Amino acid sequence: MNKLVKRRFQAGLGSEIKRVYKEGQQINTLLLAQVIQVNYKYNTVDLLALQHKEVFQNSYANEGRFSARLPMEFGGRNIVGQPYGQVNPIAVGTVVLVGFINSDKDMPIVISVYNNNDVSKQLSRTQFSNSDPKDLELIGDMHQKFSLYPSLTYDSVDGEGGRVVTFSGKSFIAFDTKEVANSSTTDAGYGTKYEDLETSYYNNGDLIEPMKGRAPNVLFKHQGVLDDDGKPDLHDLLIHINPDGTYRTSMMNKEEDWRTLFEMTPDGRVKLRKQDSINIDGGIEISELGINNEGFVYLRNGDMDLEVRKDGIYSQGKLFTADVDLSDVYDKLNGLSIQIKETNGQLEIIANGVEEQNGKISELSTEITIVAGKVESKVTKTEVQDMIDSSFVDMSDAIKKAQEDADKANKVIADMSSDNRLTPSEKIDLLKEWDIIKNEYPSYLEQAETYEVDSKDYTAKYNSLELFVTPILADMESTSSVDGATLRKTFNSYYTARIALLNSISKKLKDGITEAMKKASQASLDATQAMADASQAKIDADNANKLISDIASDNKLTPSEKYQLKKEWDVIVKEYPTTIAQAEKYAVDTAEYTAKYKALELFVEPLFKDMDETSIVDGERLRATFSDYYASKIALLKEVTDSAKTELDAYGNKISVMETNITQTSEAITLLATRVQTVEDGVQSNKAQIEIQAEQISQKVTASEVKGIVDDSINNLTLGGTNLFVIKTQTAGLLNENDGTVGTAVDNSVVSDYIKVNQKTPYIATLYGNTGTNMIITDWYDKNRTFISGEAVADSGDFSKKYVSPENAVYARVSYKKANSVNIKFEAGTKATDYSPSWEDIKGDQTALEEYIKKVEEQAKKAQQDAENAKNDAENANNAIADMSNDNMLAPNEKKQILLQWEQIKTEYPINLDQATKFGVSSQQYTTAYNALDEYLKPILADMTTTSVVVGSTLRNTFNNYYDKRTTLLNRISDVAKNVADKAQETADTINDNLQNIGGYNYVGFSSGDNMLPRLMIKNVGYYTLGSSTTEFIDSMVAVKGDATTQPFDYTVGTSDKEIAGGGLADYRMKEVKEGQWLTASANVQVIDGGSARLAIYTLEGDNWVGSNSTPIQVSDGLKRVVAQRKVTGLTKGVLIRIESADTNVKEFRFGNVQLEVGIIPTPWKKSDIDIQEDINNVVQNIKTYTAWANDLQGLDFTREKVEGKTYMYVGTSMKDSDNYSDYTWRLTDEHIEGQINGKEGAWIYSPTAPTNPSQGLIWVDLSKVPNQPKRWVDSETGWVALTPEEVKDLPWGEDGTNLADWVAQAEQRISSDSIINTVLGSEDFTSVFDTKANTTDLDNLATYEDLDSIKEDYNRLIKEGINGIDFTPYVTNSELQQLKDSFNFSVQQAGGVNMLKNSLGFSGLDFWDGTVGKNLLPNSTWNLGFGRWGGASIASFEILPPEDDKPTSHILGSIGSRSSTKEIGNRPHPLKVNSGETYTISFDYKEEALAYDKDRPILVVRNYPDKDTDQWMEYSIEGWAVMANGSTTDLTVWRRFTKTFTIGTSGYLDILPKTIVESWTHRSFWRELKIEEGSQATTWVPNKEDGAFTGGIVETTQTEELANLGFGSGFVSSKRPSSSLTQSVELPEIGANLEYSLSFYMKVTTDNPVADFKCGIRVYEGDTLTYTLGIEDATQPIPLGFQQYKLVFTPTSTSTKIEMFVENGQEASVIISGIMYNIGNIPLKWQPYPSEIYNTNVKIDINGVTVKNNQTDGYTMITPQEFSGYSRIDGNIERIFTLNGQVTEVKMLKAEKRITMEPVSVFAMNTVTDTKRIRGWAFVPSFE
């Protein structure tokens, strides 16, 4: 019976149903996520989940309003509704813990923020890991709160209440609770330093340096709104500390105009002041008490002052004495009325009075105007008078200073001339001094003329100096010989005359001033002002000329010098309108002055357009232009002065005016002294004004001081770092800098999205990897994205452009060209930093390596524990055996103990051997000890029932020996295991760090095409198919070439087999893909030689394959990234990608960086996890030969581009199925079908059972074996054959683990580039992919994709099984092992480490390298050096002609028509010493003008002479050979090359003589490129070694910055030479079947149009047989850019090897080779020099000796076994200057300054002048006198 249910009502329907709508939106767990964007406006962040890579990001339009909120310690609204809380800084990349409000995934909230362990450790304040919580001594450290802000300033509060708060510039406030005796906080001396604070350091000891080095500007303001009575609070208390340290405390009232203040300044001044103005140092009624910078105490009240000095009390600048007479003062002031009035911001003091002069009444009217706001300190009448008096003291000081400068200059010149030589650098210093003298000379002459001082002697000394110096400075590039004594004397005479002139001027001036003050009142108002300006102008001119002389001495303007010059120009611009106004007031013509100003403006303004670049400038013109301006200004102001003085002329006065220098006091007051002389008496009305302006009171500094300040400013500029240019949001196009619009793309140009910027902030944009011309366009926009301004800059190579954002700028956009090959970085700051992608372009994705680390660490710990246990066991066993054998008897019961012990030994023995083999430790001694013990115990244990007699000591020693050897073995294993574990941990850290940079997920394995064909991941199996085509690898791309030109072909990533592909997307590792999502395929595609190709993506919809295609790519498109997409439906069961020819014209296409991803937006290419695991498994590959394109550097470049994802732009995106939709049933090509049947590529079968009916070549991976065993079917007779390790390397993802042994063993030998950590996984090709640091300890908290579980299991199994099977023996290294003598040699052979090539960088020129292809033994063989040693009786019948176009570097010898029967030219001396039996070959180019001559005739002869200076004619020779030609049988009107080989019969001297016997006035013959070489084979012409410096050389050496950046500094270069070669023979220490050698080098090829047969690189010869060639062998293939590394590993069969650097057909190329490393072992090691070699640009030390070179003079000193000599270049030739020859020192020239002594005589130099005669010569005297 059915159970009855209770009654159901309509209202209850559905109550049992659970609502699942949007259940997928719910998340009930906490997640770890990474911040990918900070939304500062709302204090929220956007996140990327670390586990499933899900992004939590709201719409951009919301500006982060609904993104994840950040936690606060407190926050809310206060009682009146105002918000309060806190905002903490957070950075992109920070790891946070995330929860979800109401479990809604759209409402994330950040619960907490976590730093990685590295950062946390650095911030830790303690060095101990834990402690007793009750330990009072550590309470301060344990309970410390420490906050370090991004500005690197901090706030630290320790557990005892001590607190330190720091600010910029290392300023800080410290509160210390320790007892004073124990506290480091003190103001003693300079007080506690920032570095003395314990809190100022990271945990690792590095100092925490604030980001800003400048001291802070501090202001404390104390004020209120209302006081206690409810009235407005008017007090204003300010405490201000300026960045320069000036301290000021002020009190004011907001409704009153007064201020009281206390101030201390950095120069030691202190003052307490009350004034009637709120302005700093303002007011008229002033009371002040202070200490000035000289330490004098002063008191001031109004116009009265007192000053306490060392010698007494002063008032108004005068010393109080007991008998001071003030009557004169009263008399002068008697009758004087004073009127003070204030008008329009200035104070006028008008004094009217009368005085009696010479019995006549003289009226006096004086007006002093002080401009308000310009001069803050008031100057009284007395002060002005005192200043005028003191100006004479200042002038005396100035003269004293001039004397000191002269003394310094004389010392510098004495140092320069001490060796009677002036080098170029010394000439520059001399030029600076001479420029100063030239600039000051007219100024001093003018002053002398003004003051009527005789300047004849000064002029004479100047002229003498000019006459002496000018010829010396005519040639600034070479070293000149000078008479040092004359040079010193001439300069000294000038300086002495100058000081004498200045003293005369000073005396005349002082006398004139004193007289003038007695006879006259004040100078004319405007005349005085104009004269002040004129004097100031002169000083400014002198100072400016000196400054400009310093700046422009080298004809360059650096940025710092531009800032100095700009400062000078700004002063001129400011003074210009004032000067014009003065002139216009008196109607003075300003045309000349204006013209000079405009000329200066026109010259200097362009120099200031780019203040950050060094500019080339005409130094003389710069100096002249400034000098002209100042001269015209002085002339103008003097003219104004003259006009103003006409007022005095009206009274019949003849006034002469005398000017002084304007001096500057410590108070920065500029003074003027004048002399006014009244010529005639009479009633006079004089009027004078002294106007003191702040602009004219400015402290002057020297050029060096200015430069130092500017340099400091540059060093403190803001640095950027974060790239703001986001690649993934860029679009194709080109910005318009005039209106901010985006136009059509040009030359792969792109435009950034709107970049948020700060106003008035420096930014810098930099291009990286740019070749040729490019441009950077930057436009600025306001908050509404309305265009503000823009700028475009063009340049070549890598370059930068600096900006300051406009005041209202909120956004910027940046545009540039060649985005397919060039990177850009746009960052805040003023200095460019290394390129890095933006954070938006780098999304972290981590792969767990923890299991691997644990396994290796466990093995290391186990090995260490085994060693410890073995030691203890051995001690116990030895003690037991000692007890048993002490009576030399072994009873049956003792034998049982011995047997038990022996069984334990037999059990452990194979285990220990296995461990030793696994870790590559020699077990020979251990095995010997074991066998000895075995042999010893066998007879003893044969009978266990009787007592045996034994020798106790032998028994003990045999056991002891075994245990000792076991302990030694296990200790070695422990050491090696620990080393491997440490390296593995280091490796894991590196890989984990690098994996942070990987973005989304790529479902294509081996997708980069780096010598592995791309495969789609289906059931963890890779598939690819090829139809009618073949593949090869070119760079990082797969090149697919069709078998027939009329048949389309393709490359398929995946399989079209529906049985395999139709299992659903889960088989593609796409478990999370849902219906309605998009699959996006993208790849880089390039078409070669015509036709078009495209990318297609196909989905298996039921039983049909349905596809969508990208836009076809043509040859003209170059390398493009294309995209094709398919939408997932409910029928989708499979997917594949195809790169296919789009028509029948395609011969070849290339592709790379294939990517299949989920989503509708294509993202930058990234490696799949399979690629990364492949990198891990195969990081060190035993590669025998690297071809030209397989090199590390190019791998680095391409990998970097892959990670950035911006190498190519996306084109032809098919955003829906309708684009190029082709719905059809898939039909396999015949070759596809055949390939699946016969087991060609693509036929890999993974199964635990063998396939039935296998075809030949089929690969079966036996899954029943652990590890999996791959096998190939050979035939029915042979059956299945296991693959070799080399073949297994191509197995997808390395399931068998066979090359793991190679990985670990070779890792110890691996030496990669300096920028790569030398670890187990230190492959350059792998580690360069990644940039940022990961935190391996966080992996405990992370999970991987569920669909990676199977890979993880395989990986763990691989590690476990692989390590157990490792055979380390062939890879023993010498890193951490205690080697025995018999195994040490083999270890060194494997590890290598010694470069067997000498002079492998070229620092020693071409030493140790033999010649070039068939060394040319004939100097000047194509007359590029002129005739040189060529000559003879008929030399007048020859001339040298310029090169022709076919050989543009080879000159031509031409004969001149004459009736002479024989014309020939040879060398004297004859160039080549030859010996009997030697064979030589002569070759040369020859042509002639048309000639009717039908007989053979000689065109060149070779003769052998008995002596090198024998006359060249035939009758004087020993033997000779002639090269014959006949114009009737051979066309000789075109260039032809002739050769002749001959053998020397008699030893002698060989010469080559071009010859003609044609008697004609018109006929001419021509020769070029003569060559004589050893042997019977004529080779390509090359110049003789002596010709290299003049012809460009066949192979020369070069030192460039690029080579220095590689760590080499020097290299060999062949520049545009048809053929060149250098060889070096290397004798190998030994050879063997298993002994390998490695060769590596770096090469850079620069060429625009290589010829077809161009080749270059290095060849390896064994004996005379060429065995290997490494480099560029096919110029039709792309030639890599920049320096590329090439590697070769080979097994030689001969100990005699030869390394040859070669270039063939290189007339259009420049080739540089450097860093050649030839070492023992199969790992190409990092470059190092040959043993005992030391090379740099100045010193070389090798087996030849020591050479020290002077690069300025091209001279050098050599110390070798043969000589100790010095060489120098004399007249273009290197000559020996001195040498030690036995007991004799030979010198070319000798200079002695005082005497020469050779016992018993001394020779003294005499240069004596007496009253009657002058003695010059040598004096020979006894040496003892």
UniProtKB/Swiss-Prot annotation:
UniProt feature coiled coil, ranges: 393-466, 681-701, 843-891, 975-998
Source domain of life: Viruses
CC terms in the record's Gene Ontology section: virus tail, fiber
Keywords: Coiled coil, Virion
Location within or outside the cell: Virion
Known function: Structural protein, a component of a tail fiber.
Protein name: Tail fiber protein
